[in-house]
């Protein structure tokens, strides 16, 4: 049996540095039997944020890249296809999606994708079937 995966999006990697919440620990508590993953295109988006911004965003993107490259997270070699947006690709590859992006959460729920998100800047909530 294949293990279930939580796909972490770009803005969710920024949560620890915006709200001082350990997303890895919280996701592992909320979804203990799930593997934490992120697609390579999310890593590339974080690299772009680091390269093209200054100040806090640049620092947070750098820290998010270090977190994404930690041993707890598997980076999947998944590419964008046919001018696909990052959000469209995340919806294509996710059964459980960790995001704080309001529009992406709505689109995911409409497609029946379970969403993990930060609530009250303190803890992670799971919305959908697990």
Segment roles from a protein language model:
Residues 1-71:
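Domain-level signal for Mg2+-assisted phosphodiester chemistry and nucleotide/NA-binding surfaces
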Residues 41-130:
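Nuclease catalytic cores that cleave nucleic-acid phosphodiester bonds
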